[in-house]
């Protein structure tokens, strides 16, 4: 497996007005207590998962070569894409990016580097969606990603595919999900996608 950290790996939840997610916060974060992210890191790497926080890895599965790269959490401004920037290895059959929060600065940088697919989370699928608007439009993404991309597999013209998992959780202070059920994603990749 591959992983990067998100804000809720570093800090626990804190009560806040749920309507505050509908407005830009200017980068001001109300953080809860610090969590044992070092222990989480040790546990994940101890079972063989690859840490992609500001790292690039080349993985060979049978005859398929995958290059993966990732960033630390953009929501907390811990991302520094320059540490992993550059075109993929020419031998790679697939180049993927992993980031917790799908901020446009990260997606655009990964696109400039010709990645094929980007995995992200953070949005909870919008957590509250309006099913009667378009194809169920999210009210917010909690980042600068357009709300129509808050969950699932989407693609802009001449851009990599983006898969945003709606995830499993909610805040213990706002235990609601409307038209955005919890999910675990399984993508099957086929040659020539």
Segments predicted by a language model, with ranges:
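Short, electropositive alpha-helical surface patch
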Residues: 25-33, 69, 173-186
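Core catalytic region of metal-dependent phosphoesterases/phosphodiesterases
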Residues: 1-59
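Beta-strand-turn-beta hairpins that frame and shape the catalytic cleft
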Residues: 49-50, 56-68, 90-94, 155-162, ...
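Active-site neighborhood of phospho(di)ester-bond hydrolases with catalytic His/Asp-centered motifs
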Residues: 1-7, 52-54, 96-100, 117-125, ...
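N-terminal post-signal-peptidase region of extra-cytosolic proteins
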Residues: 53, 78-84, 139-148
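Solvent-exposed loop/turn segments at secondary-structure junctions
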Residues: 7-11, 57-59, 73-76, 101-104, ...
């Amino acid at each position: 497996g591959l992983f990067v950290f998100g804000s809720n790996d570093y800090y626990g939840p804190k009560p806040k007005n749920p309507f505050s997610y509908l407005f830009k916060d200017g980068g001001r974060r109300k953080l809860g207590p610090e969590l044992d992210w070092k222990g989480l890191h040790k546990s994940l790497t101890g079972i063989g998962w690859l840490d992609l926080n500001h790292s690039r890895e080349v993985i060979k599965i049978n005859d398929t070569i995958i290059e993966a790269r990732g960033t630390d959490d953009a929501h907390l401004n811990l991302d520094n894409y320059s540490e992993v920037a550059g075109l993929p290895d020419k031998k790679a059959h697939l180049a993927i990016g992993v980031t917790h929060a799908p901020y446009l600065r990260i997606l655009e940088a990964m696109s400039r580097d010709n990645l094929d697919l980007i995995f992200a989370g953070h949005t909870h699928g919008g957590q509250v969606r309006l099913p009667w608007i378009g194809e169920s439009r999210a009210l917010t993404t909690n980042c600068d990603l357009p709300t129509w991309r808050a969950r699932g597999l989407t693609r802009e013209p001449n851009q990599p595919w983006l898969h945003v998992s709606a995830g499993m959780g909610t805040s213990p202070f706002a235990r609601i999900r409307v038209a955005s059920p919890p999910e675990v994603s399984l993508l099957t990749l086929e040659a020539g996608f």
